[in-house]
A protein has these predicted regions:
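Short, composition-biased motifs enriched in small/polar/acidic residues
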Residues: 86-181
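Intrinsically disordered, low-complexity linkers and terminal tails enriched in Ser/Thr/Pro/Gly
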Residues: 1-109
């Protein structure tokens, strides 16, 4: 943190790992973390433009890594979300735990929408429902499902662009596969 006194006042009881002279520019950059010997532990780039979570673009929620225990690729925007609270939750989590039951009820906050004009599939996710992975799929026969042909576009609701399913055929079906992480 840059100002340990201000941080301690805003987040009492949260341990501070160290101080940082600069500041993130909220415009996207390379983040590199090194150990005391100068050896790189982690390096990744982030951005404040889509497909990165746009609600975490300064002045409100912070970026939160989804399911950090699963060692996700930090450089992929779909592995991040906006925090549920302004400023984030340093030293704590805002993840809503999954305790069994219907995965769709746990993970989705609204309807799944297919827009054939823009060729997008979108879904509003429950804030903090990090215990699941959402995977868009398409089929022409409701038996064989394909996961290829989608581009993650980001946003809230989350959107996927559809670029390779055979639009124009007599039948085309879409769904979201929801599975535990």
């Amino acid at each position: 943190v840059r100002d340990p006194v201000a941080f301690a006042a805003a987040h009492p009881g949260v341990a501070i790992a160290g101080t940082f002279e600069g500041a993130l520019n909220n415009g996207g950059e390379l983040v590199a973390i090194s150990d005391s010997q100068g050896d790189e532990i982690l390096a990744f780039s982030y951005d404040n433009d889509l497909p990165w979570p746009d609600r975490a673009d300064g002045g409100g929620p912070s970026l939160v890594l989804i399911a950090p225990g699963s060692a996700p690729d930090h450089g992929l925007p779909q592995n991040w979300r906006a925090s549920t609270a302004p400023g984030g939750t340093p030293g704590d989590t805002d993840t809503v735990s999954y305790h069994g039951g219907d995965l769709l009820t746990y993970s989705l906050a609204g309807p799944v929408i297919l827009d054939v004009l823009t060729k997008t599939l979108s879904a509003s996710l429950m804030p903090g429902a990090d215990g699941v992975e959402i995977i868009p799929q398409w089929s022409t026969d409701l038996v064989h499902w394909n996961e290829d042909g989608f581009d993650y576009l980001g946003g809230e609701p989350r959107q996927w662009g559809i670029h390779s399913p055979p639009f124009g055929g007599s039948r085309l079906f879409f769904r979201l596969r929801v599975q535990e992480r």
